[in-house]
């Protein structure tokens, strides 16, 4: 079974041809698409897209709801409550995309850690898997995950591009690993090719 676990389907580039994209995916043998929520607004949008296209594509569309580390600075008192409400939708299968990204720091590391831990607590409370993002922050992310792992039902590190040490750290926590297209890139994917 082919499942695309990280579909940024609310992006405006799909505004004109969402139905055709879904048809092509189905025709190519992709049985399930998990639409990624990266902010409160994007989480609302992907849940709405699941409802909008769910009748035409039954049992194909699912969603995550969460706040990406780039958007962690937007976390406020209402954010987690809205995510909790969205997570009650039957199409929602995970909390995230969450984690740490110290590569560009669109949000400060402290803001990212606060948002990450708030979402881990929500996932543990709701007993939903977590959909993780990490870039240049493996040591700290693993440290935080070790604190929460026993309370989480499941987790996947989406779009893994890290080192052997990071990979083994995630596997030691019994996390699933999502492989990115970088594995096919001779310049960026050489180390990743060896790990796969």
Describe the residue ranges of each PLM region.
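Mid-domain alpha/beta scaffold segments of enzyme catalytic cores
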Residues: 1-196
């Amino acid at each position: 079974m082919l499942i695309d676990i990280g579909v940024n389907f609310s992006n405006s580039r799909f505004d004109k041809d969402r139905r055709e994209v879904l048809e092509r995916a189905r025709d190519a043998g992709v049985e399930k698409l998990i639409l990624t929520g990266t902010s409160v607004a994007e989480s609302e949008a992907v849940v709405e897209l699941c409802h909008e296209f769910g009748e035409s594509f039954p049992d194909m569309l699912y969603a995550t709801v969460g706040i990406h580390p780039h958007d962690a600075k937007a976390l406020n008192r209402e954010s987690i409550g809205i995510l909790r409400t969205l997570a009650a939708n039957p199409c929602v299968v995970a909390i995230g995309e969450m984690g740490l990204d110290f590569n560009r720091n669109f949000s400060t590391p402290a803001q990212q850690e606060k948002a990450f831990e708030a979402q881990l607590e929500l996932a543990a409370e709701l007993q939903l898997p977590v959909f993780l993002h990490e870039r240049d922050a493996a040591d700290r992310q693993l440290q935080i995950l070790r604190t929460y792992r026993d309370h989480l039902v499941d987790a996947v590190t989406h779009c893994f591009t890290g080192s052997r040490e990071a990979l083994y750290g995630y596997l030691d926590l019994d996390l699933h690993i999502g492989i990115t297209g970088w594995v096919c890139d001779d310049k960026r994917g050489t180390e990743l090719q060896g790990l796969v």
